[in-house]
Amino acid sequence: MTTFTAKSETVQRDWYLVDAAGKTLGRLSTELARRLRGKHKPVYTPHVDTGDYLVVINAEKIVVTGNKLKDKKYHRFTGYIGNLKTESLEQALQRHPERVIEIAVKGMLPKGPLGRTMYRKLKVYSGAEHPHAAQQPQVLDI
């Protein structure tokens, strides 16, 4: 008997639609990262991308607990001296709400080429509309 190893060309990848309205940021992000990796499947193999495609809608309606809206900070550096930009979660949700979920999920995925291919299967939209109707995503309740 040999150990089963999934092959990336034979993995069945499904499309799922997730509504983020009223969901907690961290709890939603962990489940999204788990499904992007494919850990929910019996054919999960750590070195093969076995995850599904995820379409997240209503990213602007995400909620956080405690004082994180004011206390949580996002930093980015432009590359120029003295240009470390900092914004709170509240400001980030106003400017680009989809990026908040993307950053949270990306930090939970592996760092490297495999993690980047997993991350590309995540599609986040701030409103209720998305351009992936042709893929017929199944509604996933998280």
Curated annotation (Swiss-Prot):
Gene Ontology CC, one term: ribosome
Superkingdom field: Bacteria
Gene Ontology terms describing biological process: negative regulation of translation; translation
UniProtKB keywords: Ribonucleoprotein, Ribosomal protein
Molecular-function annotations in GO: mRNA binding; structural constituent of ribosome
Signal peptide coordinates: none
InterPro entries in the cross-refs: Ribosomal_uL13 (IPR005822), Ribosomal_uL13_bac-type (IPR005823), Ribosomal_uL13_CS (IPR023563), Ribosomal_uL13_sf (IPR036899)
Assembly: Part of the 50S ribosomal subunit.
Similarity section: Belongs to the universal ribosomal protein uL13 family.
Entry function: This protein is one of the early assembly proteins of the 50S ribosomal subunit, although it is not seen to bind rRNA by itself. It is important during the early stages of 50S assembly.
Record protein name field: Large ribosomal subunit protein uL13
Lineage: Bacteria, Pseudomonadati, Pseudomonadota, Gammaproteobacteria, Lysobacterales
The gene coding this protein: rplM
